[in-house]
Regions:
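Short, basic/aromatic recognition patches
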Residues: 94-117, 146-155
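Solvent-exposed, extracytoplasmic
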Residues: 142-175
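Conserved beta-strands of PAS-like sensory domains
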Residues: 118-152, 214, 221-224
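Extracellular/periplasmic ligand-sensing ectodomains of membrane signal-transduction proteins
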Residues: 42-103, 173-180
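Soluble sensory domains of the PAS superfamily and closely related sensory modules
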Residues: 40-42, 92-107, 191-207
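Short amphipathic alpha-helical segments
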Residues: 5, 23-38, 145, 149-153
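Juxtamembrane extracytoplasmic/periplasmic/luminal helical "stalk" adjacent to the first N-terminal
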Residues: 1-24, 105, 121-122
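Extracellular/periplasmic juxtamembrane segments that couple receptor/chemosensory ectodomains to their
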Residues: 179-224
């Protein structure tokens, strides 16, 4: 949120001068982004800001997004913003950008396989950046799901029965049993007709996750 606040303040200052910020202004946020990525206990796989087209004086579409590369090196995320290209990346259509823009609220999207070429499931957390009530972009972070799952497991593992946390579309975020793998579709596990099955909305508006408690005893991880 500190990076989002800085981007908003910078946009506000430039607007007061009758100008727009440039890509150079956003590049100055790299030190803070580095610190977030390289924290000793960080689950963050990539993070930065993505701007609404037309917000910069020198670029139509722009993102200042960095990710963890090989050997712990922080590297920039590079995407193709040439609208005439077959590989054009239209982030305006992505849910992590469109939903904060349309709702004005924080969102959590995923899990889905990342864009980084590592075939890793990630969750994208994003929040809208507004300047004087006007949407100018989002600040976000990609969280490696296998790391985030460990945090959730500390609570799930205390439950005797099979329990899992699922996303809005029904994908497994975390489970206390070897019967489920993160990223699995679990619609049938949410069958409210199953005797003893409980589905509890977790109440987090940004994520729309549910806790599913099934009537069967959990199968311990590593069990045959």
């Amino acid at each position: 949120t500190s990076v989002a606040n800085e981007v908003g303040e910078n946009r506000r200052r430039e607007a007061a001068l009758g100008k727009k910020p440039s890509s150079k202004d956003l590049a100055e946020k790299k030190k803070k982004i580095d610190a977030q990525l390289q924290g000793s206990k960080s689950c963050i796989h990539g993070t930065g800001v993505v701007l609404e087209p037309g917000e910069l004086e020198d670029c139509e579409m722009y993102l200042e997004w960095w990710r963890m590369g090989a050997a712990g090196k922080v590297v920039p995320m590079t995407l193709n913003f040439n609208r005439r290209s077959e590989s054009f990346y239209n982030y305006q259509s992505m849910q992590w950008f469109a939903r904060p823009k349309n709702t004005g609220s924080n969102v959590v999207i995923g899990p889905y396989v990342d864009l980084y070429g590592a075939d890793t499931y990630i969750l994208t957390f994003s929040l809208p950046i507004h300047v004087d009530g006007r949407f100018v972009g989002i600040a976000g972070a990609d969280i490696a799901l296998h790391k985030f799952e460990r945090i959730l497991l500390s609570s799930l593992i205390k439950m005797e029965n099979e329990a899992l946390i699922v996303s809005e579309e029904g994908r497994v975020i975390a489970a206390n049993t070897a019967n489920w793998t993160v990223g699995d579709m679990a619609h049938h596990a949410m069958n409210r007709q199953e005797t003893g099955c409980r589905v509890i909305e977790l109440g987090e508006a940004a994520a729309h996750w549910s806790l599913v408690q099934r009537p069967c005893k959990r199968k311990h991880r590593g069990a045959a």
